[in-house]
Amino acid sequence: MTDQTTRLPIRRALISVSDKTGVVDFARELVALGVEILSTGGTYKLLRDNGIAAVEVADYTGFPEMMDGRVKTLHPKVHGGILGRRDLDGAVMEQHGIKPIDLVAVNLYPFEATVARPDCDLPSAIENIDIGGPTMVRSAAKNHKDVAIVVNAGDYAAVVEALKAGGLTYAQRFDLALKAFEHTSAYDGMIANYLGTIDQTRDTLGTADRGAFPRTFNSQFVKAQEMRYGENPHQSAAFYVEAKKGEASVSTAIQLQGKELSFNNVADTDAALECVKSFLKPACVIVKHANPCGVAVVPEDEGGIRKAYDLAYATDSESAFGGIIAFNRELDGETARAIVERQFVEVIIAPKISAAAREVVAAKANVRLLECGEWPAERAPGWDFKRVNGGLLVQSRDIGMIKAEDLKIVTRRAPTEQEIHDLIFAWKVAKFVKSNAIVYARNRQTVGVGAGQMSRVNSARIAAIKAEHAGLEVKGAVMASDAFFPFRDGIDNAAKAGITAVIQPGGSMRDNEVIAAADEADIAMVFTGMRHFRH
């Protein structure tokens, strides 16, 4: 069976949309192709106001819209026209005056936008639960053998092009039907998520607790890429992205050149980009195996990202080999040249890539170059997920940040202004290092990173070893710990290494002993009251 033999000509279409983007031009093209248009409510008025001939559904069914528009299309003459099997139900349709409807263009009430409003209450949300729309969508998708369903304005042009070629093929109708079921599935999921957070005890109207966890968790992800393999070659893998686009991320980034992203590339790029987003001034983050191995921040007038890259690389040049590099400023040609002439790199990501940088990196065809766009200074709340066997752990994103005024000085000596700058820098980095995490830093450059050890004191030892190996001086540096020190040995070792100031959450049963150790060594120590475990 060829495409030509499965093409479905369209004689009658029903159009009823909440999002009216492109619908006037779409309907005009259909009419030009000889298609009769049925429509409802606001869509009908819009078409008529633009000079497009259409029949109102109420006139076709002989039954008016009622109950403030709750009942418009729920009628046998509508659903019979959509669901009727052309090879089986023709006689029944003719007997009851039901005309075949060959194309349905419907999108649904804006439920998500409605419940996102701060003043939305339960009655408002309920009125924005679409009933007739999903019913028509599902009817048309079920009968895709004989009917085309269009739920996305982005498909209008392709549908018109197919009709001009003689009709929609079965493969095209099947794909449109799949999109339709994905659309209604996501819509029902949003409703269930919202209703699952309603606290009926607050008032008779019911109020959504926007920080609550719904009874069932519904989220839709769309396959963006099939991968050669997963974390290891014997594992199959694909990359799925959230259907609803959020802030700039690895999921929204555009790949400008290079080999296809691997499973590990995506995970590591996410770690690098999310870390570099923490800094307002020009910054560079180099990541290997999801851990920052070098981070630096340099103001524009002191060298910007070009200098920041040099300093980040200097932290651990061995680990930087084959790493991921992220910037929070546009990648310029000079910085790009410094990277490709110095090291092997898997991925470079930045909010923008200059033409000069693209030209430089083009000489290294395998380097993956990603442009992700700008992000807001304020991080948006959201959810983090961790899969366990048979379940899913869900938590709010760790967007906790601290400022100098949030720090609690617990030692006799207060940190200097420069130490405070370095402590906050090191704290931001420690948040993205696998626990137990220790970060040594000076002048907003990491000088040693200890990651992923079962004991915190061993992470501190590794950070010191890394610094020594890189030829970086620990004496005079500061130290950040992602969680509290359970014993004073971590501070004693820091003192021996020459650390002058420490930032940590506090909260240990032995905080007094840890503070005493810092005082004995004249180390300034501050508590954040916030932990940043990362497993």
UniProtKB/Swiss-Prot annotation:
EC number: 2.1.2.3, 3.5.4.10
Metabolic or biological pathway, per its Swiss-Prot or TrEMBL entry: Purine metabolism; IMP biosynthesis via de novo pathway; 5-formamido-1-(5-phospho-D-ribosyl)imidazole-4-carboxamide from 5-amino-1-(5-phospho-D-ribosyl)imidazole-4-carboxamide (10-formyl THF route): step 1/1; Purine metabolism; IMP biosynthesis via de novo pathway; IMP from 5-formamido-1-(5-phospho-D-ribosyl)imidazole-4-carboxamide: step 1/1
Keyword list, A-Z: Hydrolase, Multifunctional enzyme, Purine biosynthesis, Transferase
PROSITE patterns xrefs: MGS
Coiled-coil ranges (or none): none
Gene Ontology BP term (one): 'de novo' IMP biosynthetic process
GO cellular component: cytosol
Listed Gene3D superfamilies: 3.40.140.20, Methylglyoxal synthase-like domain
A Pfam family assignment: MGS
InterPro entries, alphabetized: AICAR_Tfase_dup_dom_sf, Cytidine_deaminase-like, MGS-like_dom, MGS-like_dom_sf, PurH-like
Catalytic reactions of this protein: (6R)-10-formyltetrahydrofolate + 5-amino-1-(5-phospho-beta-D-ribosyl)imidazole-4-carboxamide = 5-formamido-1-(5-phospho-D-ribosyl)imidazole-4-carboxamide + (6S)-5,6,7,8-tetrahydrofolate; IMP + H2O = 5-formamido-1-(5-phospho-D-ribosyl)imidazole-4-carboxamide
Residue ranges annotated for the MGS-like domain, each copy included: 6-151
Family: Belongs to the PurH family.
NCBIfam families per the UniProt record, alphabetical: PRK00881.1, purH
Domain remark from Swiss-Prot or TrEMBL: The IMP cyclohydrolase activity resides in the N-terminal region.
Official protein name in the record: Bifunctional purine biosynthesis protein PurH
UniProt organism field: Pseudomonas paraeruginosa (strain DSM 24068 / PA7) (Pseudomonas aeruginosa (strain PA7))
